Amino acid sequence: MPEGARRDLAGLRREYTRAGLAEDGADPDPIRQFGRWFEEALRAGLYEPNAMVLATATPDGRPSARTVLLKGFDERGFVFYTNYGGRKSREIEANPRVALLFYWGELERQVRVEGTAGRTSEEESDAYFATRPRGSQLGAWASRQSEPAESREELERRLAELERRFEGRPVPRPPFWGGYRVRPERIEFWQGRENRLHDRLLYAREGPGWRRVRLQP
């Protein structure tokens, strides 16, 4: 039996004591509240505070999840970029209802987002792709995401071919690569508290605005 399977996990716990989340201290707009917490995560020096778990599902309800990087957010939603041929994209195209999760353990916080994903504009995807390091641009061309690979060497050979192909000129965005924007319908802010009586504030879209409610932990 693996060592980890024999380990007693029942005692792995911690007390949350850092802060609280009260209605009178939270912004009535969830995007502004997210921006406030995101800035605090940046100031705290968290490793990749823009990392978020993206959950998708097939039309028949088979879920899958992976970590992607947030590359922008505003009142329209949360943006990430990916290969349009990979599993996550295929599932989004068939079933655009998705969920996001930000976990900032050092701050004893998490943010959950539920909404609908749609592609960003060609212009927006082009503008972001142009900011990527050249190696990442070439990597986007080299990867046939989620398809089987014969070997690591196969990928390295493809990358070398692309380096020769685009030598001395800008790397354009591949037509099979771009962004998605998740338009939020529900955003929940969770703050760990003592005795597991955590603070949970849920914002639900209601007409042109948002309705906020406190949830029991």
UniProtKB/Swiss-Prot annotation:
It comes from the Bacteria. FMN binds at residues 66-71, 81-82, 87-88, 110, 145-146, 190, 200. GO terms for molecular function: FMN binding; pyridoxamine phosphate oxidase activity. The keyword Transport does not apply. Its EC number is 1.4.3.5. PROSITE patterns: PYRIDOX_OXIDASE (PS01064). Its cofactor is FMN. It catalyses: pyridoxamine 5'-phosphate + O2 + H2O = pyridoxal 5'-phosphate + H2O2 + NH4(+); pyridoxine 5'-phosphate + O2 = pyridoxal 5'-phosphate + H2O2. Substrate binds at residues 13-16, 71, 128, 132, 136, 196-198. GO terms for biological process: pyridoxine biosynthetic process. Pathway: Cofactor metabolism; pyridoxal 5'-phosphate salvage; pyridoxal 5'-phosphate from pyridoxamine 5'-phosphate: step 1/1; Cofactor metabolism; pyridoxal 5'-phosphate salvage; pyridoxal 5'-phosphate from pyridoxine 5'-phosphate: step 1/1. Catalyzes the oxidation of either pyridoxine 5'-phosphate (PNP) or pyridoxamine 5'-phosphate (PMP) into pyridoxal 5'-phosphate (PLP). NCBIfam families: pdxH, PRK05679.1. Belongs to the pyridoxamine 5'-phosphate oxidase family. Homodimer. This is Pyridoxine/pyridoxamine 5'-phosphate oxidase. The gene is pdxH.
